[in-house]
Design a protein with these regions (language model features):
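Short cysteine/histidine-rich metal-coordination sites, predominantly Zn2+-binding motifs
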Residues: 127-128, 149-160
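Short, intrinsically disordered, charge-biased short linear motifs at domain edges
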Residues: 110-113, 118-128
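Short cysteine/histidine-rich zinc-coordinating motifs and their immediately flanking basic loops
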Residues: 136, 144-153
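Short, intrinsically disordered/low-complexity patches at protein termini
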Residues: 87, 143, 155-157
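ATP-dependent adenylation/nucleotidyltransferase module used to activate substrates
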Residues: 1-114
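Structured loop/turn residues at beta-strand edges in well-structured enzyme cores
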Residues: 47, 119, 133
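Local cysteine-cluster metal-coordination motifs and their immediate loop/turn environment
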Residues: 38, 122-143
Length: 161
């Protein structure tokens, strides 16, 4: 891991319960979505795919700069110049962000409608067997399920919203 983040480096604390923070969180992983999208675009080009999907969200989120619509738009513009598929062949690979403008509540409702296997998902920043229930990600997830009126099927150490 690169380090520099509460998710990848033990020198940093994972914040608990401050979902309304207005500064960059210590759980930000440097260039994470830049790296993911770079790999995904390369793989899409090899496969001949025309779309790459990423689950970024900028409504109820922890303030990561690479989850913002502006980042996705700029990366799309860069990708249009950076791959043979787009720059030479004229075959566009479009980045799709279906969760970008949805609240956590709306994401839970959509997932429920689509039959998403929520029991196999894990959002906790602390990475334990059970979700902690107190980190930002757990709080946002729990709040989304509560607002949607849907029972969150995963195990938590504590379930305080």
């Amino acid at each position: 891991a690169i380090g520099g983040s509460g998710l990848t480096d033990g020198k940093f604390e994972v914040p608990e319960g401050d979902v309304n923070r207005h500064s960059g969180p210590p759980t930000y992983v440097p260039a994470r979505n830049l790296i993911f999208l770079s790999y995904a675009m390369g793989y899409a080009e090899v496969l001949g795919a025309t779309h790459v999907y990423i689950g970024v969200n900028s409504v109820d989120y922890s303030g990561y700069p690479d989850c913002r619509p502006e980042f996705i738009q700029k990366f799309q513009a860069l990708a249009n110049y950076a791959t043979t598929a787009t720059a030479v062949e004229g075959r566009k690979i479009t980045i799709e962000t279906p969760l970008q403008d949805l609240s956590k509540k709306d994401i839970v409702l959509l997932g429920t409608k689509l039959g998403a296997p929520f029991q196999f998902t894990h959002s906790c920043y602390k990475g334990g067997e059970k979700a902690c229930g107190i980190c930002d990600s757990c709080k946002l997830r729990l709040r989304g399920f509560a607002e949607a009126g849907v029972e969150d099927p995963i195990d938590y150490e504590t379930r305080e919203i």
